[in-house]
Amino acid sequence: FKNGLPDRLIEGGEFTKADYDVRQGRVIQAAHDLVAGGKPCLPPNPDWDQTFMKTLLDGELAAYDDADDNELASIGGGGVHEVKTWTAAFAALRAAGVYQASIDCYHAIPEWLTGMGVMRAVQT
């Protein structure tokens, strides 16, 4: 990274307004390109997202154990780290005891280059 972001994340440092503006500009341009039919990245994949959320809901946490990052990215886009984070969160829930989960909502938002889902879990 030319902007030193990894160093700032690890060692701390200021994320300036100019840094933010550059990043925001890239995201806005990618969203415009995607909506206009361009392909800077994969569009949201609501079917895959909802299947993944249902997998978590059903407690099938090993379902993606054999998938590598490239495979997940080719299906689900750039949110591979989120897949791992959600899976880790549900594994922690399981380790803490019995729980009941629900999918509260999901919306694909192409202009944001993503789908947004909300799940909740309560220990029972």
Show which residues each predicted segment covers.
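Flexible, D/E/H-enriched segments
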Residues: 2-124
